[in-house]
A protein has these predicted regions:
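A short acidic, Gly/Pro-enriched loop at the edge of an enzyme's catalytic core
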Residues: 1-10
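Alpha/beta-hydrolase-fold catalytic nucleophile elbow
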Residues: 13, 44-47
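Short "lid" loop at the C-terminus of a central beta-strand within the Rossmann-like core
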Residues: 16-17, 39, 48-53
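A short glycine-rich, Lys/Arg-flanked "PGG" loop and its adjoining helix->strand segment in the class I
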Residues: 17, 24-39
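Short amphipathic alpha-helical segments embedded in low-complexity Lys/Glu-rich regions
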Residues: 25-29, 48-51, 60, 133-140
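SAM-dependent methyltransferase
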Residues: 46, 50-123, 128-130
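Core SAM-dependent methyltransferase catalytic element
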Residues: 123, 157-177
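Charged, often glycine-rich, active-site loop that binds/positions anionic groups
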Residues: 138-159
Length: 177
């Protein structure tokens, strides 16, 4: 990297959960972002909503989605906490995630976004937007139904998501700081 603070945007897509293994990893990520983003720049990303996954796994050790009896994703609880306290960081809360298109299971960690926002503020970042993929889907559907021509803009080749695909997708949120 040529100079610090050279980037107007830093992107971290589908990987923040790895930094929730421990505090040092998370602080290293945030320090790296802070060191390399220009004043007024944006830090954008996507991650699972850890609280939603925690709630999903409250009564089951494993949840999965299928299409035609084939498992397309599964999330397995590998932690012992019984409550998800948003005021605490909750580092190291492992889940095992399998996504068919990736083809293997990976260890990930629950993201406590409330804590993430709080620690980002300490580094001078303000949350601009935190939005669930479900809301993007609703907005997209509404735009397709209510466009000016009264015709759906939907690409005829676009496949409709199954309920199980939606369930996995809707666990994701985007953020902008």
């Amino acid at each position: 990297i040529p100079n610090k603070n050279d980037f107007s945007m830093v992107s971290c897509q589908f990987c923040v959960h790895y930094y929730f293994e421990n505090e040092m990893k998370l602080r290293t990520l945030i320090q790296n972002v802070s060191d390399n983003i220009t004043m007024g720049g944006y830090f954008i990303g996507t991650c699972f909503n850890g609280k939603n996954i925690f709630n999903m796994l409250k009564s089951n050790k494993l949840v999965e989605g299928k299409i035609d009896d084939k498992v397309i994703w599964k999330i397995e609880k590998d932690y012992k906490i019984r409550t998800f306290n948003e005021e605490k960081p909750n580092f190291g809360q492992k889940i095992k995630v399998y996504i068919d298109s990736i083809g293997e299971t990976h260890t990930e960690y629950l993201v406590n976004f409330t804590y993430f926002e709080k620690i980002m503020k300490k580094y001078g970042f303000e949350l601009v937007e935190y939005k669930g993929f479900e809301q993007y889907y609703v907005d997209f559907e509404k735009d397709n139904i209510n466009n000016k021509n009264g015709n759906k803009n939907k690409n005829k080749n676009m496949k409709e998501l199954s309920q199980d695909e939606k369930e996995l997708s809707f666990l994701n949120y985007s953020f902008v700081f």
